[in-house]
Amino acid sequence: MGKQEVKTRNGERVAIVAGLRTPFARQSTEFSQVPAVDLGKMVVSEMLARTDIDPKLIEQVVFGQVVQMPEAPNIAREIVLGTGMNIHTDAYSVTRACATSFQAAVNVAESIMAGTIEIGIAGGADSSSVLPIGVSKKLAANLLALSKTKTLGQKLNILKSLSFKDLMPVPPAVAEYSTGLSMGQTAEQMAKTHGISRAEQDALAHRSHTLASQAWKEGKIQGEVMTAFPEPYKKWISEDNNVRHDSTLEGYAKLRPAFDRQYGSVTAANSTPLTDGGAAVMLMREGKAKELGMEILGYIRGYAFSAIGVEKDMLMGPTYATAKVLENTGLELSDLTLIDMHEAFAAQALANVKMFASDKFAQENLGRSKAIGEIDMDKFNVLGGSIAYGHPFAATGARMMTQTLRELKRRGGGIALNTACAAGGLGAAMILEVE
């Protein structure tokens, strides 16, 4: 029997009344000059306009940004100040790597459950194009010392100690701080450990692009994606530019492995690309939504987060978090209408799919007597996944939530699982319900 109830003390559910995102654009394309904070303001402003809600009714904004910009460390507060909300609106930022906007949504939901707010906005935005480029440790130390000198001679002595190498810019780190391993290296390890072939990975990537292309062509995605006019406002973007509308399985086989050149199977094509974009959802106390006459997309029925070791299988978070959320809600895998899993890499997604069905893995790692269950692939990532749409780190969770709720509504309702892996061995899982 499930023990988790996402309800207020009066028994009201937490409703999601709106979801919106920018188009997702590959690094250094349409959003090449747009920082994450502006992507966040862009999508929240449009959401407020579309819902026609008085911005001053928003009581809390929880937003995230994985690649932090030093000049705007609290993206949530900048969004409040830049979108016409009440200046007294509470706003704070969170980060849970690729599961950031799931965390943001949970935080707002918990505020509603506690009765401290009735309406809130959650989401995330990231730019892989506008990045904080750092300096070497030696240059940083010398610049600090330089600021404390008083004479020209002292300044010259400090500057003379610097080499050309010390002056080189330092890009943001792509590896785990604790292990030095990149996500791609972990995906390679998971492919080898769990027997995920190159052909299987390429097939999933092709499936993702094919289904995403079909969803766009059938008009299923347009309603949740705004048209953006990035500076200098001469062009606009209204669709994701990573989706391959001409995807062929043969095309994937041409690419060389990206992380293990000799024996690897993870390529740029069967992985998510670096992406720019923002996404948000609006949550309300169920009664408040009805009082305001808002259409309810659906409800959060349950959620769970997980944390595992980072040395091996670091991206197995969906399996661990899903086991927890199903236990929390008293559901079985067979109860689900849809399953949407973040595709950081085809290898990672397929390894998780495999472990969902493994009794041995469940007994040794999940504290379960039997497997979570074998995933019915007719329910899995039915509109394509992150490999096709792209992955602005903090925005992906909100994209998945909105996309899933709208698809459930098209199908006449049901229950769905959203789940994602995240850096640091973290995982997230959320159960959504549409009546």
Swiss-Prot record:
Reactions catalysed according to its record: an acyl-CoA + acetyl-CoA = a 3-oxoacyl-CoA + CoA
Alphabetical keyword list: Acyltransferase, Cytoplasm, Fatty acid metabolism, Lipid degradation, Lipid metabolism, Transferase
Positions annotated as active site in the UniProt record: 98, 391, 421
Keyword Translocase: no
Any single biological process term in GO: fatty acid beta-oxidation
Gene Ontology annotations for the cellular component aspect, listed alphabetically: cytosol
Biological pathway: Lipid metabolism; fatty acid beta-oxidation
Intracellular or extracellular location(s): Cytoplasm
EC number: 2.3.1.16
Keyword rRNA-binding: no
Pfam families membership: Thiolase_C (PF02803), Thiolase_N (PF00108)
Molecular function via GO: acetyl-CoA C-acyltransferase activity
Family per similarity comment: Belongs to the thiolase-like superfamily. Thiolase family.
Protein name: 3-ketoacyl-CoA thiolase
Gene source species: Vibrio parahaemolyticus serotype O3:K6 (strain RIMD 2210633)
Gene that this polypeptide is encoded by: fadI
